[in-house]
Regions:
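Generic marker of residues within folded, mature protein domains
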Residues: 26-28, 36, 46, 73, ...
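Aromatic- and Gly/Pro-enriched helix-to-coil junctions and flexible linker segments
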Residues: 49-53, 57-72, 76-231
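Short, acidic Ser/Thr/Gly-rich low-complexity loop/linker segments typical of extracellular
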Residues: 21-41
Length: 231
């Protein structure tokens, strides 16, 4: 399947820096628009909202991104947008042959449960921690502390003197995530270079963390969080 998400760019006078949406998470808010299946020949045909910056991530069977698209595309109303693949020359054209997807009607995106919304730690990830982790990671029995509603001031920078309010649980969890920074070198990533399984968080859970069995849907939420650069 493909995960389709959109960038919600910052408005004038809105906070705009590497830490605006999370620690080194990027400049902009991201909204998951939905997923769409991929045909056996690798083709896909689907509709997207017009005049919206769109990014695409191919997913594995568990719902984790195999590759990251570090750019975006937009479509005008009624426009047909096509691409030849993540690793192909941008000046090349598709092979002139019929694909499985082209013989079918364009699919509508399967929107996430609860609808399209900004993907935030407090709304998406904290409930996963509440259900699976906080019974032990409660500031008393085990560290780190993953309880909610504990706001702290995060200070960064010698020249900029940035002070921001973050959830303590976010500050405690994000170091366990392996992801690219907001201004990484511009090169084509190797497939699975930043796969969620490379993050210590996922490795701990998959290895069996004190008998905790995180439900599949909650794991998919963690995968999405990692794939969006841990906002």
């Amino acid at each position: 399947a493909l995960r389709i998400f959109a960038y919600e760019y910052a408005y004038i006078l809105a906070p705009s820096d590497h830490d605006a949406q999370g620690i080194q998470s990027g400049w902009d808010i991201k909204r998951i628009l939905g997923t769409v299946p991929v045909e056996e020949d690798g083709s896909a045909l689907f509709t997207i909202p017009a005049n919206t910056p769109i990014s695409i991530q191919p997913l594995d069977k568990d719902g984790a991104a195999i590759q990251w698209m570090r750019s975006w595309l937009t479509g005008m109303p009624g426009e047909i947008v096509s691409c030849v693949g993540c690793h192909e020359d941008q000046n090349s054209i598709p092979i002139p042959k019929r694909t499985i997807a082209s013989a079918k009607q364009a699919r509508r995106l399967e929107t996430p449960e609860g609808g399209v919304r900004p993907f935030t730690f407090r709304l998406e990830v904290q409930p996963v921690l509440d259900r699976n982790c906080v019974s032990c990671h409660n500031g008393k029995n085990a560290e780190p502390d993953f309880r909610k509603d504990q706001m702290v001031t995060y200070k960064r920078g010698i020249l900029t003197k940035i002070n921001k309010q973050y959830d303590q649980s976010y500050l405690n969890l994000h170091p366990y995530v392996y992801r690219q920074g907001p201004e990484s070198d511009i090169y084509v990533l190797k497939p699975a270079e930043f796969h969620a399984s490379n993050s210590e968080l996922i490795r701990i859970l998959q290895a069996g963390h004190h008998g905790v069995e995180v439900p599949e849907e909650d794991m998919r939420t963690l995968y999405a969080w990692i794939d969006l650069n841990a906002p």
